[in-house]
């Protein structure tokens, strides 16, 4: 029989890693950190690290629960807007190594990523671009700090299936004691193409989340449900110049 040429695609088609991400269907999101111990959702950036002192934390128990519920991965808030880091970074004192947890020798990013490997589910990280603790937020120096943090997370914890960049950017914060409000241009300040290049080089299988993609995006609400017939359009104009 005569061969028939496949028609050209008339709509955008997903990359292979986006297809794999969709196949996961459900995964857990762990919003945990210094705020957990200070009754805050969005920390101001001024909470004392000494208040972070979980005494019965068991990341393996977390992952076992996720596995039993049918989830295929987990994403962790490695750093939320308050700027506190759940890994022992050398880039700031505002991190887990200056807490009572395991006498400053803990690393929850490591503990959770290792538990994921042990029980066979995927691991991902959330890294807030906005940082209400750092005195230099809003300057070019902070952007370099942000990229060094991103490099640490991409280089030291094995494979990650997603990198989550939150859309909340700029506003009031502690900022090294200045206690003021700072405004940035979210489309240009972080130079996101640089982030995408770094991720493609260090974690090529990872899907990138932001308000507008390029891998996947915010569903549009925080109720846990997408609207009916959600085509997951990537609203690039909200994030990129």
What do these predicted regions represent?
Residues 1-241:
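Mature catalytic domains of secreted/periplasmic carbohydrate-active enzymes
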